[in-house]
A protein has these predicted regions:
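C-terminal binding/interaction regions
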Residues: 1-55, 60-77, 81-169
Length: 169
C-alpha cells in the first residue's frame, strides 16, 4: 500500500526530497465548474459586468496562480513551468474551467493544474458576486497526469456531472 510521502519517520510533516528523482516531462489537466443563475450567465455573455470580462480575467488569474503554487500549498516544490493553459467557457448554467500545465522537472504538476482551476473559479465568483452571491464552485478535480515514477493517471469518469441539466434555482 502506498504511504503518504509528506510524513517523516517520526510523523512530522516534511517536504519530499526529490533530488534523486529523474527529470522528465510532467503534464497535468484539471477541471472545475462555477454554477450560476441564468441571469448571471446572460450578463456574462453580454459582457455586462461592472468589473469587466470575468472569463478573461479568470484565465489570467489561473495562469498567475499556477506559477505561485508553492506559495499556496506549503509543501509543494517551486517548479519551472514550461506551459500553462487555462480556458473558461460559458455554458447554459455556468462556467466550465480547464487547465493544462507542463514542466520538465523532478516532480509532478498536478497541484499546479488544480490551483489554476481553483484560482480561476474564485475569480469568476469574485467578478460576478454582485449579481449572485449564491454561485457554487463545484467539481474541481484532476483529469489526468503524465510522467514520473508513479506513471500516468487518466480519470475514467467524472465523480459527478458538473453541469446538471434542468436544475431549478
Amino acid at each position: 500500500m502506498p504511504k503518504l510521502s509528506h510524513y517523516g519517520k517520526r510523523g512530522q510533516v516534511q517536504m519530499v526530497d526529490v533530488s534523486a528523482k529523474q527529470v522528465t516531462t510532467r503534464t497535468a489537466k484539471a477541471h472545475g465548474f462555477v454554477r450560476m443563475k441564468p441571469r448571471v450567465v446572460s450578463s456574462v455573455r453580454r459582457l455586462k459586468n461592472p468589473k469587466g470580462n470575468p472569463l478573461e480575467v479568470a484565465r489570467i488569474a489561473g495562469i498567475a496562480a499556477a506559477k505561485r503554487t508553492a506559495e499556496w500549498i506549503p509543501l509543494c516544490h517551486p517548479l519551472p513551468l514550461t506551459h500553462i493553459d487555462v480556458t473558461a467557457r460559458l455554458c447554459e448554467n455556468g462556467v466550465e474551467l480547464h487547465s493544462t500545465v507542463i514542466a520538465t522537472a523532478q516532480t509532478g504538476v498536478e497541484m499546479e493544474a488544480l490551483v489554476a482551476v481553483t484560482a480561476a473559479a474564485l475569480t469568476v465568483y469574485d467578478m460576478c458576486k454582485a449579481l449572485d452571491k449564491g454561485m457554487e464552485i463545484i467539481g474541481i478535480h484532476l483529469v489526468e497526469k503524465t510522467g514520473g515514477k508513479s506513471g500516468d493517471f487518466h480519470r475514467e469518469k467524472p465523480s459527478q456531472r458538473l453541469a446538471p441539466r434542468g436544475r431549478k434555482r
